Amino acid sequence: MARARRVKRDSVTHIYQTCKQAGTCPSDVVNKVEQTTVADNILKYGSAGVFFGGLGIGTGRGTGGATGYVPLGEGPGVRVGGTPTVVRPSLVPEAIGPVDILPIDTIAPVEPTASSLVPLTESSGADLLPGEVETIAEIHPIPEGPTIDSPVVTTTTGSSAVLEVAPEPVPPTRVRIARTQYHNPSFQILTESTPAQGESSLADHILVTSGSGGQRIGGDITDEIELTEFPSRYTFEIEEPTPPRKSSTPLQTVASAVRRRGFSLTNRRLVQQVAVDNPLFLSQPSKMVRFSFDNPAFEEEVTNIFEQDVNSFEEPPDRDFLDIKQLGRPQYSTTPAGYIRVSRLGTRGTIRTRSGAQIGSQVHFYRDLSSINTEDPIELQLLGQHSGDATIVQGPVESTFIDMDIAENPLSETIDASSNDLLLDETVEDFSGSQLVIGNRRSTTSYTVPRFETTRSSSYYVQDTDGYYVAYPESRDTIDIIYPTPELPVVVIHTHDNSGDFYLHPSLRRRKRKRKYL
């Protein structure tokens, strides 16, 4: 069994002050404060018959009483043939008598006609200033600087003398240039250039070095400062998932907490539990009680009261809402399984008395929607990630250009139609409508495209998902057709066409009633 902790009692003086008026003071407290203990009585009554005044007890004089002090470790000592000498400390005699009387000078009366100004020379006050104090001042001469020889020019002519004074030399000025660069994570440096003197990098900082060697200023490095590593722009932090929430609106008031604690909708002994599967229970629950029209401007977020005539009886759209006279506002909560529950408390008017009072049970209509789970962390992918290697392409070295005037039309000149110069291919190759396919493996996939005979120009596109595509914009100019006249030849050549080809005029084509081609 553990012993009880001992509580320290209050001081005797404080206990006596508080309990004296009530008369409940303990006897030991009263005896100690009023000095009526056994020891106090012995000293009080014993001092009347015994006198200890000559011993010096409690006098504070330090004389040791009538016998004096005895050194430690020695006896009192006995001297043969004489009286022992008592060793006493020396005391300063205190003179007892009247205090010395100091004479006070009498002050002569001041005449009314005398001046109130007292000259300083007539002041009889004591000199409060100290006497003469010897002051020693040490004078240090200023060191002489370097002498500058200035040439002096003297003339003996009658004109004014001109003295040429050389300017003082200006001391060299020390200049210190500092540069500070701040890291901007939203700006990324991408350097691509031709190989030249220096080095380039794709990191956050660019260091360009040239020349041979350098010079260190400040001597050897004696102190090393520990640097803090800043996170790179490719690193990111993954936040921990938030704890599971109990409701979508966690704000709770005191009134709602008291109401929930006093009355529970899930009490099956007092409230009937009805699960509703109709989606109208969330938006327009009144349509489940009676037939009504739609009002898009009205939101049923309040308590609905339904009045019904006694003589008339209407079947509700939903049998679960039979005889409902009042349907409360929606309440949101969570179930033990973690689902969101929308609840409405309804009151039935099953029995009606002659006085007009309706009696009915209370019904709890509810519907479970979904659960509120914790957010799973989403792993983000890096956009624009590269290996750090730069590709440098020098166009003038790897390409060949031919100086050719494309705007010049070779057919615009007067050239003989039978000349062999027309057979030369002097046109510029145009690959604007072509497609470049580069495969990444040796075995390529072959596609068989059926070919149909038709007069129309057909275009086929084959999609290869294993390669790379290079697409260029395509632009075509529509040229107006010039119809021939009797003065024009059968073959019409347009000088605006740079391709150098020709086509047959539509009027010279064969006319057939049935179409052979699609």
Curated annotation (Swiss-Prot):
Disulfide bond sites: C19-C25
Protein name from the UniProt record: Minor capsid protein L2
Keywords attached to this entry: Capsid protein, Cytoplasmic inwards viral transport, Disulfide bond, DNA-binding, Host endosome, Host Golgi apparatus, Host nucleus, Host-virus interaction, Late protein, Microtubular inwards viral transport, Phosphoprotein, Viral penetration into host nucleus, Virion, Virus entry into host cell
Lineage: Viruses, Monodnaviria, Shotokuvirae, Cossaviricota, Papovaviricetes
Domain of life of the native organism: Viruses
GO CC list: host cell; host cell endosome; host cell Golgi apparatus; host cell nucleus; viral capsid
Pfam entry (one): Late_protein_L2
GO molecular function, one term: DNA binding
Motif stretch (Nuclear localization signal): 1-10, 510-517
Function per UniProt: Minor protein of the capsid that localizes along the inner surface of the virion, within the central cavities beneath the L1 pentamers. Plays a role in capsid stabilization through interaction with the major capsid protein L1. Once the virion enters the host cell, L2 escorts the genomic DNA into the nucleus by promoting escape from the endosomal compartments and traffic through the host Golgi network.
Subunit structure: Interacts with major capsid protein L1. Interacts with E2; this interaction inhibits E2 transcriptional activity but not the DNA replication function E2. Interacts with host GADD45GIP1. Interacts with host HSPA8; this interaction is required for L2 nuclear translocation. Interacts with host importins KPNB2 and KPNB3. Forms a complex with importin alpha2-beta1 heterodimers via interaction with the importin alpha2 adapter. Interacts with host DYNLT1; this interaction is essential for virus intracellular transport during entry.
Modifications after synthesis and translation: Highly phosphorylated.
InterPro entries: Late_L2
Any one GO biological process: microtubule-dependent intracellular transport of viral material towards nucleus
Keyword presence, Disulfide bond: yes
Assigned protein family: Belongs to the papillomaviridae L2 protein family.
Gene: L2
Protein's UniProt keywords contain Cell membrane: no
Subcellular location: Virion; Host nucleus; Host early endosome; Host Golgi apparatus
